[in-house]
């Protein structure tokens, strides 16, 4: 009798696709319309887009930390900068503000975020150095309305929805 309840897992070798050398690389997400992979380097203040067909990588550098990216259209993504949600035009890198995020006088920054099935961006803040309870979880509507959902959050991370669209 087997004592393991785990299904058999096929182990396949991993291959490095791109040497980003990120300081804090996070938030990878597939862009279904562009067929590319996006991720951010939070401390490096950079947004990356990897093109698997050509094995090339595009990047956009910002003047503040960038902590999350979500696809919007085939030519735009929404990102969370340190204290602001912005739309990035992927053709020219131009940004437009969607909504400011309260930064508690420079004591917190945006961290992880994802869009829910209704199109609202859920994004959390965290204190520099991750002090307990310094952050807040917000939603940002497509119109840019910011709503506080949960206070005294330490780190919002790994925000996802289940297949039945529950948080």
Question: What do these predicted regions represent?
Answer:
Residues 51-55, 89-93, 140-144:
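Short loop/turn segments that connect beta-strands within beta-propeller blades
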Residues 77-116, 127, 131:
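Glycine/small-residue-rich loop that forms an oxyanion/phosphate-binding "nest" at active or ligand-binding sites
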Residues 19-53:
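Intrinsically disordered, low-complexity, positively charged segments
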Residues 20-34, 63-78, 104-120, 149-167:
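Beta-rich, blade/repeat-based domains predominating
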Residues 13-19, 55-61, 96-103, 145-151:
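A short beta-strand motif characteristic of beta-propeller blades
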Residues 31-32, 37-42, 78-83, 123-131, ...:
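Conserved beta-strand positions in repeat-built beta-propeller and related beta-rich domains
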Residues 46-48, 84-86, 135-138:
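A short loop-to-beta-strand structural motif that recurs across blades of beta-propeller domains
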Residues 1-7:
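Bacterial Sec-dependent signal peptides at the C-terminal "C-region" and cleavage site
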């Amino acid at each position: 009798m087997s004592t393991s309840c785990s299904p058999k897992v096929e182990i396949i070798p991993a291959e490095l696709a791109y040497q980003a050398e990120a300081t804090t690389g996070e938030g990878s997400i597939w862009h279904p319309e562009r067929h590319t992979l996006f991720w951010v380097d939070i401390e490096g203040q950079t947004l990356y887009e990897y093109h698997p067909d050509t094995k090339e990588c595009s990047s956009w550098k910002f003047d503040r930390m960038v902590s999350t990216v979500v696809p919007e259209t085939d030519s735009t993504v929404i990102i969370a900068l340190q204290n602001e949600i912005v739309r990035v035009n992927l053709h020219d890198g131009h940004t437009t503000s969607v909504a400011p995020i309260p930064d508690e006088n420079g004591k917190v920054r945006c961290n992880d975020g994802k869009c829910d099935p209704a199109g609202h961006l859920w994004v959390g803040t965290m204190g520099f150095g991750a002090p307990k309870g310094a952050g807040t979880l917000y939603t940002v509507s497509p119109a840019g309305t910011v709503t506080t959902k949960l206070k005294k959050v330490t780190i919002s991370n790994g925000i996802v929805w289940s297949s039945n669209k529950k948080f």
